[in-house]
């Protein structure tokens, strides 16, 4: 028979680890790049864009469409890095239990 007090302690420990992982993710920054670094997007762990850097060579009217595409690619790159880190952080808090694909941290 499982010791109920031990079970509660484990649940509280897991909850604390999850809260710590969420705080760590919220404070993390992820840099996405596109076009060999011509466009960089820095996003927070909450998915908010903090900064966009654009190489001056792309600031021409004829480069508008390519610039729009590169910004999108750079943002998606940063978001993918955030998602991977989120999976790893939460999995660590859950003692190695893998999460289902597409599961997001609750924030």
Curated annotation (Swiss-Prot):
Keywords: Cytoplasm, DNA-binding. Pfam families: YbaB_DNA_bd (PF02575). One of its GO terms (cellular component) is cytosol. GO terms for molecular function: DNA binding. InterPro entries: YbaB-like_sf, YbaB/EbfC. The keyword Cell membrane does not apply. It is found in: Cytoplasm, Nucleoid. The keyword Ubl conjugation does not apply. Homodimer. Belongs to the YbaB/EbfC family. Binds to DNA and alters its conformation. May be involved in regulation of gene expression, nucleoid organization and DNA protection. HAMAP family: DNA_YbaB_EbfC. NCBIfam families: DNA_YbaB_EbfC (TIGR00103). This is Nucleoid-associated protein RAF_ORF1224. It comes from Rickettsia africae (strain ESF-5).
């Amino acid at each position: 028979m499982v010791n109920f007090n031990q079970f509660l302690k484990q649940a509280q420990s897991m909850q604390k680890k999850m809260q710590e992982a969420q705080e760590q993710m919220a404070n993390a920054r992820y840099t996405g790049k596109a076009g060999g670094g011509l466009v960089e997007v820095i996003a927070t762990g909450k998915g908010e864009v903090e900064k966009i850097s654009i190489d001056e060579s792309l600031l021409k009217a004829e480069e508008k469409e390519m610039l729009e595409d590169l910004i999108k690619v750079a943002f998606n790159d940063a978001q993918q890095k955030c998602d991977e880190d989120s999976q790893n952080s939460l999995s660590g808090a859950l003692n190695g239990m893998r999460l289902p694909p597409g599961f997001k941290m609750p924030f």
